[in-house]
From Swiss-Prot:
Pfam families: Endonuc-MspI (PF09208). Homodimer. It comes from the Bacteria. SUPFAM superfamilies: Restriction endonuclease-like (SSF52980). Its cofactor is Mg(2+). This is Type II restriction enzyme BsuFI. It is an enzyme of class 3 (hydrolase). InterPro entries: Restrct_endonuc-II-like, Restrct_endonuc_II_MspI. GO terms for molecular function: DNA binding; type II site-specific deoxyribonuclease activity. The lineage of its organism: Bacteria, Bacillati, Bacillota, Bacilli, Bacillales. One of its GO terms (biological process) is DNA restriction-modification system. It comes from Bacillus subtilis. It catalyses: Endonucleolytic cleavage of DNA to give specific double-stranded fragments with terminal 5'-phosphates. Its EC number is 3.1.21.4.
Amino acid sequence: MNKDNQIKNESGKQAKILVSEIVNNLKNELGINIEIEEGYSIGYPNQEKQFKMDFLVQFTDFDNEQWLIKSTNSIRERIYGTEFFAQNIRLIDEKVKNIYVVVPDSISSAEMKKKRNYSVKINGTTYTSFLTDVLTVNELRQKIVEKASQNIAQGLRANVLGNDAETSIVNLLNDLKNKALWNDYQNAQQTIKSSTYKIYKEILEKIDLKEGFDKILEVTATNDIPLLSNRGKPKTDVSVTIKTNTKELIRNISIKNTREKTVTIHEGSVSDLISRLKLSETDPLSQALIHFEKVGSKKKLIAEHPNSDKILEENLKLYNRELIEFLHSPLLNDKIQMVDLIIFTNKFAVWNRDDYIKHYIEEYSGKGQFGTPFKWTYPSKKRGQKIQIKGFSNN
């Protein structure tokens, strides 16, 4: 076997190992209730089991629904053979719902373009395919987690997905495979496969590091963050220290893992907000905020305190930046709690803090209330006692 074929075979082997590691990690570490079979094969009655896929994932909590996975490094190679297998499998095995072709997230930009193009083709209206989609390994992981957690109660589901998002970011930053790909992508990508390199690269580029130029010596990420002074949870979810050949960087990351368009970002006494905005108790804006807390909604405020509504409409927007800083950085007692980067995991995006504040004000001030980029209300059963402020996600 010549060297090129050896590299090609090793590359395919590593891609398959990567998928195996990911799905088994979901079962054994995250506790997702799935069964995994490697080397799926099936055939017509009394004939050879000639139609094959690399993995079967069975969802125990969903009537044993089955997904099949074909791992590859190249969409072009053998894709029509995979389509042929998928066509026959669907005729034979009624339990199979989805069939995915899966590629490592670390494939070249040219291969990623082919992946996206074939995905569009599959999901279009002018092409018949027996595949469900073409995914990266990380996209597959997300789909499995979302499917397996559908029947979990909403609050618990949010906690599970939130904790998983934090752990995933820590793991991908600490992953030595990502470090190797960053330092020498052209050589490393031939045999090293990663499910998270694309995310890793976006995070590092957001803090002004350059792939292949800023050589990574060591990365240490943790989600062990000290509590706030009131024992509450800080906005920082992950802190990472990066040592390169020329410098050392520390960045603190807030992870937003939600499918909702708005999320609660603050509940508490309006006095905390007044204090943070450095307003006196007799300031008309303070009195207007107190009136809002008492009635709990803009509609009631207009009815009972129309002048206070006018004051909020005219003045609260002048404090938009201070509001964002208060809502994202309350009660700090340790510099590790100050957020530098914000990561959205559902509709993936990475922002540095200052750019995000500017973007948030410009994008959402017209969608909130009182000229602010927030929705203002009260917590359930706490009307007249506390305020609740909802912020916009990027969904």
